[in-house]
Amino acid sequence: MAEPSVLTVIPVLNEELHLDRCLRSIRSQTLPRDQHRVLVLDGGSTDGTREIALQHVRESISGEGPVVELLDNPGVHVPHARNLALKKVDDESHMFEIIGHAWVPPEHLENRLADLQEAEAEIGRSIGSMGTKIIPEVTGGLWGESSIEALLSSPLGGSGQFARFKGRSIAESPAFCLHRVEAIQDVNGWDERWVVGQDRDLNLRIAKAGWPVMRSDASYLHMAKRRSFSSLWGMGHRYGYWRARQASVSVSRLRVREFLPWFGFLAVICGFALSGEVDGSIYLSLYLVTSYASVALLVGLLEAIRFRHISLILGVPLGLVILHISFSLGLLRGGLKQPPPANERVKSANH
């Protein structure tokens, strides 16, 4: 039986701040050179991204790690890049999906392949997708940046790709998957309608086609997150919008917890509105507001203890409020089928 091989796919657009670290981590993988190849797909960067990628292309020719290739991505967005990479598969058995502002330890792919083979031996069949764990890095930087990093790994702010977990298990939305090429081809690749949430959509379709979709803590990944609360607002609004748009395909893709802020807000408004007619309704509203604030502050305290960063006591609750409001407004905007919000991370991606 042939050894598994990996095509690492890196869609980029104006990633000069992080791409060098990403590519150095990928080129430092312990996986043998003949089992690993790297494709960087540029969506039209206007900064130094292409120059950084080309430098790694040149270095990889005579280096010990995988060969790095740079391709243009006329479609600009992530799903277009990944479908283009799918067409460029040679004899690789798996595709590793990463982004230009993420990086991994040297044994990442080797450990994940070994873990994947062990899991397949246990269940007696091939696995379609195996996700990994995102580990936060709170390094004492800017208050907003540290708060967002902690927030997205917290119980209230982190779910889906940012979820905390241990071991190996079935998952609905695993992060940075190692996909079996055959499984991707089985569902005709990524749906290019979804410029956000395309990986969750892919994994749902892979699972529906009968392939196991799992996650494992056999390795981990670091990712540069938003650096300000204004960019967190933009992220939440954009993600909420596209989640609602994907619900037009299947309502089952929405989760009840995503509507809890709306339920709470409407309950509070009703309580105040009915205070003159229904005894105790105003106290219900005050109870809901106080409970939310208390839980948010408790999460902030726990994250401050976890990261030993006292400013997170206020930063995490503030981030939670911003994330919940922006995501909820995004859901409303998407449900009303209004034009999509702008990309807060890369302005040139808006067209």
Residues covered by each model-derived region:
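A conserved acidic beta->alpha catalytic loop
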Residues: D42-E51, H101-P105
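Glycine-rich, basic loop-to-helix element that forms the pyrophosphate-binding segment
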Residues: D72-D90, N111
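Membrane-embedded multi-pass helical conduit in multi-pass membrane proteins
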Residues: G264-P339
